[in-house]
Amino acid sequence: MLYWLIDLSSSFPAFNVFRYITFRTGGAMVTGALFVFMFGPWIIDNLRLRQGKGQPIRTDGPQSHLMTKKGTPTMGGLMILSGLTVGTVLWANPLNPYVWIVLAVTLGFGFVGFYDDYMKVTKQTHAGISGRTRLLIEFIIAGAACFALVWLGRAPLSSSLVIPFFKEVMLNLGWAFVVFGAFVVVGAGNAVNLTDGLDGLAIVPVMIAAASFGLISYLAGNAVFAEYLQINYVAGTGELAVLCGALLGAGLGFLWFNAPPASIFMGDTGSLALGGMLGSIAVAVKHEIVLAVIGGLFVLEAVSVIVQVASFKLTGKRVFKMAPIHHHFEQKGWTEPQIVIRFWIIAVMLALAGLSTLKLR
């Protein structure tokens, strides 16, 4: 909305500042943070009042969780999504279609996660929406978004998988890219969902990935920078940096309340939405493979679950003491702060590795 102040710049030259994506990204970040700081306590109190016993804790998990996390409300993703939405609506260019496509995926996945959390809390069980139903809805949302991105973009780039490290090497998948893109978005959403198991574990790597893709979006959406770095120019995607800024701000606000011992969990409401957002941005800016590097921590968590389930079904034996892998380290005696901070360090290193691909051509 504030973007429209540019129209008054002839009378008020100071309003020219709203032309700059960097300025509006900073504004979105501050707005998202302030919103969560201001309304977070009220949201937490209401969720605690309405949920009663809070998020059900796994009885087969680390026994310490039954004592330290019992009664903690979930659905904290509502705080993040509210701050993200307010920051985006206020500061992003309302005429940019990429903004609305990514925001639609984010809120759509957030709704799926919210309903899943609602089922778990009301029934006090880990069985929310059936896995098949949840995946079906996610694929419908992601597929529609990827179809829009392919239709909106410049052919053949919009329907191609770009290979990093090489100049102009890409695989044109045609409309099959819609299916591939949907897998990227759904995979990212569920990978972040699996990572969200300890206080602060998911939100910081999400913010690191968001900062990385905010930079990538800005560069890919700028013809000069894209040509210099020899990456594919995708007109209009620079505006996605504003969304990433809003997420960073809202994430910082949420971390204030999610720091151990957490006052609230983001739940599926937050983790599915944020993962879906990262996946859809990666598809929009044509850096799907780079997402697997920058979000390597999420990939590791997801792969650990896949390996654990496959191994147990095929051999009757478990590879890890418990999956996802952060619980494996808990069972090995690592403290929660050790796991969380070490995983943060890994996330930073992976983000730097992913960003380095921008120059390696």
Curated annotation (Swiss-Prot):
Superkingdom assignment: Bacteria
Catalysed transformations (reactions): UDP-N-acetyl-alpha-D-muramoyl-L-alanyl-gamma-D-glutamyl-meso-2,6-diaminopimeloyl-D-alanyl-D-alanine + di-trans,octa-cis-undecaprenyl phosphate = di-trans,octa-cis-undecaprenyl diphospho-N-acetyl-alpha-D-muramoyl-L-alanyl-D-glutamyl-meso-2,6-diaminopimeloyl-D-alanyl-D-alanine + UMP
Keywords on record: Cell cycle, Cell division, Cell inner membrane, Cell membrane, Cell shape, Cell wall biogenesis/degradation, Magnesium, Membrane, Metal-binding, Peptidoglycan synthesis, Transferase, Transmembrane, Transmembrane helix
Molecular functions (GO terms): metal ion binding; phospho-N-acetylmuramoyl-pentapeptide-transferase activity; UDP-N-acetylmuramoyl-L-alanyl-D-glutamyl-meso-2,6-diaminopimelyl-D-alanyl-D-alanine:undecaprenyl-phosphate transferase activity
GO biological process, one term: regulation of cell shape
Protein location: Cell inner membrane
Enzyme class: transferase
UniProt-listed InterPro entries: Glycosyl_transferase_4, PNAcMuramoyl-5peptid_Trfase, PNAcMuramoyl-5peptid_Trfase_CS
CDD domains: GT_MraY (cd06852)
Residues that span the membrane, as ranges: 25-45, 72-92, 95-115, 135-155, 169-189, 200-220, 240-260, 264-284, 289-309, 338-358
Enzyme Commission number, as recorded: 2.7.8.13
Cofactor: Mg(2+)
Membrane topology label: Multi-pass membrane protein
GO cellular component: plasma membrane
Keyword Magnesium (UniProt): yes
Pathway linked to the protein: Cell wall biogenesis; peptidoglycan biosynthesis
NCBIfam families recorded: mraY (TIGR00445)
Family per record: Belongs to the glycosyltransferase 4 family. MraY subfamily.
Function: Catalyzes the initial step of the lipid cycle reactions in the biosynthesis of the cell wall peptidoglycan: transfers peptidoglycan precursor phospho-MurNAc-pentapeptide from UDP-MurNAc-pentapeptide onto the lipid carrier undecaprenyl phosphate, yielding undecaprenyl-pyrophosphoryl-MurNAc-pentapeptide, known as lipid I.
PANTHER family in the cross-refs: PHOSPHO-N-ACETYLMURAMOYL-PENTAPEPTIDE-TRANSFERASE, PHOSPHO-N-ACETYLMURAMOYL-PENTAPEPTIDE-TRANSFERASE HOMOLOG
Listed name of the protein: Phospho-N-acetylmuramoyl-pentapeptide-transferase
Gene symbol of the encoding locus: mraY
